[in-house]
Amino acid sequence: MKNSKNLLVRYLSIFLIFGSINIIAQDNDEAIEEVVVTGSYIKGSPTDGASPVEIISRDTIDALSASTVADITANLSINSGSENNTDSFTSGATQGSTNVNLRGLGLTSTLVLLDGKRHTLAGIAANDGSVYVNTSIIPVNAIERVEVLKEGAASVYGSDAVAGVVNYIF
């Protein structure tokens, strides 16, 4: 009797061990949905919260006949005080450079992102001595859309986003 119980326990344990492999090895036929996040690791969309996000699409850029990023920047309702310098008579050392100044808080208070990543500062200083991101190096034809966060986002992005964030998506 003892051997038959022992044998039964062995068969049962072998069945449980090898029987569960088929359960684990089953294929999963679920479709995987692609999720693209630009800007931050905080979940949500521009319409979820109270943050005012303006999205300038490729169609709008084409309708503006924008040939430079300065043309796009000049048409932002929240932009104030950008130094988009094209000639040497008014610009000094910043000739040919463009920048973004949201709400007139200064060139260093607006964060500029390229596909959600921080852009490096230019090697030149503005007329007031501040260092900024030179947006004239961004090709307009490569821009798919521009996302503008119109409020301070220093708690999410850091101190250089006090005035807001401009994200150029390619």
What is each of the regions a protein language model found here?
Residues G39-Y41, S57, L102-G106, L114-G116, ...:
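Flexible glycine-/small-residue-rich
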Residues N28-E30, G49, N79-G96, A126, ...:
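Short, glycine-/polar-rich solvent-exposed loops and beta-turns at beta-strand/coil boundaries
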Residues I32-E34, D48-V53, L64, S97, ...:
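Extracytoplasmic
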Residues I42-G44, D62-A63, T108-S109, R118-L121, ...:
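Short beta-strands and strand-coil junctions in structured, solvent-facing domains, enriched
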Residues V69-I72, V100-N101, L113-D115, V133-S136, ...:
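N-terminal periplasmic accessory domains that precede
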Residues K117-K150:
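Short acidic/polar hinge/loop motifs at secondary-structure boundaries
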Residues M1-A66, D71-N75, T135-I138:
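N-terminal Sec signal peptide and the immediately downstream disordered periplasmic leader
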Residues A74-R118:
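Extracytoplasmic beta-strand/coil segments of soluble accessory domains associated
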